[in-house]
Curated annotation (Swiss-Prot):
Binds 1 zinc ion per subunit. It comes from Pyrococcus furiosus (strain ATCC 43587 / DSM 3638 / JCM 8422 / Vc1). Belongs to the class-II aminoacyl-tRNA synthetase family. HAMAP family: Thr_tRNA_synth (MF_00184). This is Threonine--tRNA ligase. It comes from the Archaea. Its cofactor is Zn(2+). Catalyzes the attachment of threonine to tRNA(Thr) in a two-step reaction: L-threonine is first activated by ATP to form Thr-AMP and then transferred to the acceptor end of tRNA(Thr). Also edits incorrectly charged L-seryl-tRNA(Thr). The N-terminal domain (about residues 1-143) is an archaea-specific tRNA-editing domain. Catalysis of tRNA editing is performed by the charged tRNA itself. Pfam families: HGTP_anticodon, tRNA-synt_2b, tRNA-Thr_ED. Homodimer.
Length: 625
């Protein structure tokens, strides 16, 4: 349920027409209404509320009364308002929930009015404008069914005691509340976010508007929340990122595999691992057997490793899969655009190491690999904050190693230390992006796992022919691909707030060059130019719309096109092109071959995919609005 609470001088409404087939029956008197000195509750009842309407009604009544007490309102008004959500409950459910809220407020002794359900209504409202006059609330019911919650998650949510510090590149370990965050504002935000451990998304982050405006990604009302649809431009960006990260990991030395997306709850090793991994699962029934959808590639890669014959000469042994998809049944209130999903694409590498020294060596290399991967998508260490998590014993034994990592990143990092080991790992780092709402999301991460080799029966033969259990490193050098897209868009949103021009990295731009003829007369030359550019494996399109040149240029600017090429009589006669480069705003005249050379130099070493849409703008559908 979504509520907008407005403390008002008055609210008045007038019914105009039916909005649904079977609206609430009303009398002539109820077609108009007014209430003065009133707290108005605009309410959208959502589909998720159908799971537990009793709880939603009770929570809504309590929220409204709490605000009424704060603003000293005795008059309350319940206004059905479908426009606060895109995932509405059935009209029959919504009407009943609203009726019960209305009756419940009356029973608590308030003077309560309401607008009828299921009609188009005109309304006027006069907001009082004080600090508490406009408030929003989101109510999420507990699951009606008992959900599978692993023991590790229960411990994380109830028992885990963390000790927080800041570690500097000079090796100084400072309690977080004693650290001077001057010059490290983002680190302060990240530390506050981590220590609070609140993941609820109470506002829409800026990247959501951008992903919709650019027709990249959208919500899918026909699926479970947290499962998204990708339009052609968004699919191109996601596909290029998938290819880029996979190539980097394979180049690093990993062997690519493919494994199932669902696993048996009753498999002894898997059952134990589930209770050591802090994540909620999707449950799938096949006949009378219960399966869970994977939340990482661990299971499949561990099962392969268990069945393999491995020598010490094979170590470190690296195995990789890009999971499309992994699934985590995140709480509804925590879902947020591309930042936190229930279905996501995870590059997942596991490395078997013979001992702690080899594991540390791999950990450091994968730390560097992660920095390199994020650098390729336009994220520098200035764009993310580092968290390193370990037990007190590990710190005491390997302090110098941890400080080496901090020196690599070149700035202070957040430390989470535990007196005892709660999870299967003894050391973990993440690179975390802090967005425009001061929420953080983990991107790259590596862990050293000391439990699962024995749990799954993964062994190698040492120099003496004896079977030993390896250590296992879990590594995602980028984090979920969707989160990389989120970080890129949030970074551009921040640049826009600073008055700077946003743009995708050139190799990721869905259209890298747009050719604009000054008039229809020069369309043939524009197509010739586009053909030459496309032949060099550069994504190019042509704006053939019959509109003013200035409007075409504005459209290209709005789409963040890196290179705008304008052609007219002069360019046609001289065989040249006039280029407007978004990166620095420079406008210059050049030859087609020179532009091709410039773009190829800037995109060297990155993957390429063809243009995702028709060449001519006039031939393209609109996917939104």
């Amino acid at each position: 349920m979504r509520m907008l609470l407005i403390h008002s001088d008055y609210i008045e409404y007038e019914v105009k027409d039916k909005a649904i087939k079977n609206p609430e029956p009303i009398s002539e008197e109820e077609k108009k209404g007014r209430m003065d000195e009133v707290l108005v509750a605009f309410i959208s009842v959502e589909k998720v509320d159908e799971k537990n309407p009793d709880e939603v009604v009770e929570k809504a009544i309590n929220e409204i009364i709490e605000v009424a007490k704060q603003v000293k309102a005795e008059n309350l008004f319940v206004y059905p308002f479908a426009h606060l959500s895109s995932e509405l409950a059935k009209p029959s459910v919504a009407q009943e929930v609203l009726r019960r809220i209305y009756e419940g407020l009356k029973e608590r002794g308030y003077n309560v009015g309401k607008a009828p359900f299921g009609y188009y209504k005109a309304f006027r409202i006069s907001c009082k404008g004080h600090p508490l006059a406009e408030l929003s609330r989101t109510i999420v019911p507990e699951e009606a069914k008992v959900e599978e919650v692993p023991e590790a998650l229960k411990k994380e949510e109830t028992e885990l005691v963390s000790y927080w510090y800041i570690l500097t590149p000079e090796g100084e370990l400072v309690e977080v509340d004693k650290f001077d965050f001057t010059g490290h504002e983002n680190l302060r935000k990240f530390a506050n976010y981590e220590i609070a451990k609140s993941r609820i998304a109470d506002k829409e982050p800026p990247h959501v508007r951008l992903m919709l405006e650019h027709e990249l990604v959208d919500y899918e009302p026909g699926s479970d929340p947290g499962n998204l649809r990708y339009y052609p431009k968004g699919r191109l960006i996601k596909s290029l990122l998938e290819q880029y990260v996979s190539e980097k990991v394979i180049e690093y030395g990993a062997m690519e595999v493919e494994t199932p997306i669902m696993y048996d709850f009753e498999h002894p090793a898997l059952e134990k691992y589930l209770n050591r991994f802090p994540a909620r699962q999707y449950i799938v029934l096949s006949g009378d057997k219960r399966y869970f959808l994977r939340f990482a590639a661990c299971f499949g890669q561990f099962m392969i490793s268990k069945d393999a014959t491995i020598s010490y000469r094979n170590l470190p042994l690296r195995m990789y899969e890009l999971t499309r998809y992994s699934f985590r049944r995140e709480k509804r209130g925590e879902l947020s655009g591309l930042r936190r999903l229930r279905a996501f694409t995870m590059p997942d590498m596991h490395t078997l190491a013979k001992d702690i020294e080899q594991a540390k060596d791999e950990f450091k290399k994968q730390f560097k690999l992660s920095m390199e991967v994020l650098g390729g998508v336009g994220l520098t260490p200035d764009d993310y904050e580092v968290a390193i998590r370990f037990t007190e014993d590990f710190w005491n034994e390997h302090k110098d190693f941890i400080i080496e990592l901090v020196k690599l990143i070149g700035k202070p990092v957040l430390i989470e230390m535990w007196k005892q080991r709660f999870f299967y790992f003894i050391l973990k780092f993440e690179f975390n992006f802090v967005d425009n709402l001061d929420k953080a999301a983990a991107l790259s991460t590596v862990q050293i796992d000391v439990e699962n080799a024995e749990r799954f029966g993964i062994t190698y033969y040492d120099e003496n022919g004896e079977e030993k259990y390896p250590l296992i490193l879990h590594c995602s050098p980028s984090g979920a691909i969707e989160r990389v897209m989120y970080a890129i868009l949030e970074k551009q949103a921040k640049l826009m707030q600073e008055g700077k021009k946003p743009m995708f990295p050139l190799w990721l731009s869905p259209i890298q060059v747009r050719v604009i003829p000054v008039s229809k007369e020069y369309l043939d030359y524009a197509l010739y130019v586009a053909g030459k550019i496309e032949g060099a494996r550069i994504r190019v399109d042509v704006d053939d719309e019959d509109e003013r040149l200035s409007k075409k240029i504005r459209r290209a600017e709005k789409e963040w096109i890196p290179y705008i090429v304008v052609v007219g009589e002069k360019e046609k006669e001289t065989g040249t092109i006039t280029v407007r480069r978004r990166e620095d705003g420079k406008q210059y005249e050049t030859r087609i071959e020179e532009l091709i050379k410039e773009i190829k130099q800037k995109t060297e070493g990155f993957p390429y995919k063809p243009r995702p849409l028709p060449l001519l703008l006039s031939q393209r559908p609109k996917f939104r609005g």
